[in-house]
Amino acid sequence: GTLELVRSLGPEVVSSADLCQVALAVWSADALAAHRDACRQVAEVKDAAFEYIRYGLANHTAVSEFGVQEFIRAEFARRGLDMDHPAIVGVNQNSGNPHYSPSEKESVPIQQGDWVLIDLWARHPGEQHVFGDITWVGFAGSRVPESQAAVFTVVREARDRVVERLVEAWHGGEELQGWQLDRVARDVIEGHGYGEQYVHRTGHSLGPGPSVH
């Protein structure tokens, strides 16, 4: 590739990651305020999306992955928030695909007893603003099966350990990188025997720019 070609000609290639972070990833006070408001609204839309599913199932109205995705898109548009691409709505096995996206032609119906993942994000218009981005799962029924509850408990423990490590580092004046927090989460997951099912990194950075990733 290009990197190998340049190196073959003699120059030493170094990463520009630190330069990019200082120049492009600094948040202004306005960006922080807009991000917090976007997070609040994204959480509200998440609640509305699960209520949309609950209401549809309770009233025997057809509900699908694509239908929920479209509901989320319309709700963000109504609020004047931007998305860079549609939300992820995955049912059962599709919830295990980190980059799954339903379409009008390929969409699974949501039924009683299904496991539903919703990953959604939005921001106030403008690349100077930062996306709010969250992922939630829910069970379409009155009682979550023990097997799924057990896995959720493990994931929640991993999440809490990461937050605890962040707080500890903050109070201690310690700098952390993303891979170190990913390792904290992986250690918990692997410790419970689910290491091979950990198919995606733990989260991603957020900052100003054209995309949520």
Write out the residue ranges for each language-model feature.
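Active-site neighborhoods and metal-handling regions in enzymes and metal-associated proteins
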Residues: 1-213
